[in-house]
Structure formats: C-alpha cells, structure tokens
C-alpha cells in the first residue's frame, strides 16, 4: 500500500512538472494535474493541499540550492574573502553555477518564467534583496577580520550584481544553451566578476 502511495505521489509530481512548464502556474489547473496523473481530484488534494503547495514542493530543491549558494559564499560562516586569491576559487564558483543549472534546469525555468500567481512569484526580488543584505554584512565581517581591507561599494551596486546573476540565469535558460556553451558563458562571467572585484578590493 505504501509503494502505491509513493508511486502515486511521483506520478503527480511528474505530471504537474510537465503541465507547469507548458502552461505556467496560472494556466495549469488542479483538474488538469489530476487527469494527467490518473487520480481523482479529491485524491490529489490528499497528497497536496493546494496547487501552490504542489508547486512549492517541485521547486524546493532549486530554491534550497540557491539559498545554499548564498550561505556558502556570503553567509556569516561562509568563505573568507582571502579565498578569492586562490587559483581554485574560479573553478569552484563555475562548478557551483553549472551544478545548479544542470540539476535544476526545469525547476529554474518554472521559478523564473512560470511562477506568476504562485507564492514563489516574487522569489527573484526576495532573493536579490536578501543577497544584497547578506553580502553587505559579509563585507563588514571581512573588514573586521582583515585590517588592510579598505574599500567602499554602494548598496545599489551590490543589488545590481545580484540582479545580474539572475539575468545571466534567465538568458541561459531562455535560449536553452547547451551544456558546453553554458560552461563557456559562465566561465567568462566568473572571470569578469573576479577580475572586477579584485580590482575594487585591491587584492
């Protein structure tokens, strides 16, 4: 019986992913999802209390990955800024971006292009503001740890950098860049970003 329940849940998740990608959150109805899953509408609600709850379950691995990237890079227990000088830093950052896109491509498309009307519709704006605060706090922490680190950057410039990251993701996804081209674009982005930050921080 438990196996049947697990299989049913997987069918619902698979069918709803396809429908959300095709029609968007607003266009896909719970009736559509139930029909595509081979379950009754009432049974669908047994597994997920609402369409929004189902949408959030589908996208949670992707949103968790983005939150994790922020915490690892700029959280209070994240990287020390001195790591930016290591030769391995650029490759590590590139691998992190590539990994998120490879593992969560369809979910990122839903999050960035198909989430209108859901509780995740404003995720991009929420994340940009959170990342801006996080990076500013991280810079303050780094200045207390490294007495020779003396540079100023405006809050809005940090905000723009976070917006730029999402623009990069959106363009890669919108144009369905193949893996090799995605890697080349991300390599240029990471190189450009690191050269700029090193110049600004005089390191």
Language-model regions, residue ranges each:
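Helix-turn-helix
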Residues: 11, 15, 19-53, 57
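An amphipathic alpha-helix signature
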Residues: 91, 95, 128-140, 183-194, ...
């Amino acid at each position: 019986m438990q196996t049947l329940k697990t299989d049913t849940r997987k069918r619902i998740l698979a069918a709803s992913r396809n429908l959300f990608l095709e029609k968007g959150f607003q266009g896909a109805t719970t009736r559509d999802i139930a029909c595509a899953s081979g379950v009754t509408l009432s049974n669908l609600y047994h597994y997920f209390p609402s369409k929004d709850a189902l949408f959030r379950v589908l996208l949670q691995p992707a949103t968790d990955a983005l939150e994790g990237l922020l915490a690892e890079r700029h959280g209070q227990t994240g990287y020390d800024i001195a790591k930016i000088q290591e030769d391995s830093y650029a490759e590590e950052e590139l691998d992190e971006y590539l990994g998120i896109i490879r593992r969560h491509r369809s979910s990122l498309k839903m999050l960035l292009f198909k989430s209108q009307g859901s509780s995740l519709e404003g995720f991009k704006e929420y994340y940009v503001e959170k990342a801006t605060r996080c990076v500013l706090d991280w810079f303050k922490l780094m200045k207390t740890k490294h007495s020779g680190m003396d540079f100023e950057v405006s809050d809005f410039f940090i905000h723009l950098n976070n917006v730029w990251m999402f623009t990069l993701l959106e363009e890669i996804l919108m144009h369905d860049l193949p893996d090799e081209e995605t890697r080349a674009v991300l390599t240029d982005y990471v190189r450009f970003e690191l050269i700029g930050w090193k110049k600004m921080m005089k390191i």
